Design a protein with these regions (language model features):
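A structural "domain/chain start" motif
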Residues: 2-19, 27-78, 189-192
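Conserved acidic
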Residues: 68, 72, 118, 164, ...
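Sec/Tat-exported extracytoplasmic proteins
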Residues: 83-88, 132-134, 179-188
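Surface-exposed short loop/turn segments
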Residues: 87-143, 149-167
């Protein structure tokens, strides 16, 4: 055909060569986050991320006793411990994680005829600080949040409403635990 020529074949070959060269040059730049014994910036072998995360001691989260916030605080702490240790138990504490939590609930959809909430958003805002145990130096100070929606069933289904709220709160604590784990993992790998 008239549009195919040696010129386009040569261009295609040059493009493939450029892609192969770029791949070869950047191949050593990437490492798995949870890989075994990742090399650190100075070339020495750093402990892997799983081992570093397992050394984080999660402090109790302050909440008034016998309130929904207390249950959510316990759930968040349990989710964090599981995310950091993988369910295997903690190592010797090298870092402490202190958490301050705020809970909010907002009506998302309201029936205009009855004034009843049909869907709501459960929000959890968290401020957290990672401190080295030995030096008491703050190494990470950050915030995160989660917003999760839940449906509110009819007035006759009180237990279903409580379960929907609890499910939304549990999903929000899981999201926050995963976000904190990811942030701490990036700190242990890159020091950021």
């Amino acid at each position: 055909m008239w549009w195919r020529s040696n010129h386009t074949a040569l261009g295609r070959l040059v493009r493939w060569a450029a892609v192969a060269a770029a791949a070869a040059l950047t191949a050593a730049c990437f490492q798995p986050l949870y890989g075994e014994h990742s090399p650190s910036a100075d070339g020495s072998v750093a402990p892997n991320v799983r081992e570093a995360l397992a050394t984080v001691q999660v402090d109790q989260i302050a909440a008034q006793s016998a309130t929904p916030e207390a249950r959510i605080a316990v759930q968040l702490r349990n989710d964090l411990i599981f995310e950091l240790t993988g369910g295997t138990g903690a190592g010797t504490p090298a870092n402490r994680l202190a958490i301050k939590m705020r809970l909010s609930k907002t009506a998302m959809i309201v029936d205009i005829a009855t004034g009843r909430t049909e869907a709501e958003i459960v929000g959890i805002d968290v401020d957290y600080t990672l401190t080295e145990v030995g030096s008491k130096k703050v190494v990470v100070n950050s915030q995160t949040f989660a917003r999760v929606s839940s449906d509110v069933p009819g007035l006759q289904q009180r237990f279903a409403h409580q379960r929907a709220q609890r499910d939304a709160e549990d999903r929000a604590t899981k999201v926050i635990a995963e976000q904190i784990r990811s942030r701490l993992a990036s700190h242990f790998v890159a020091g950021t």
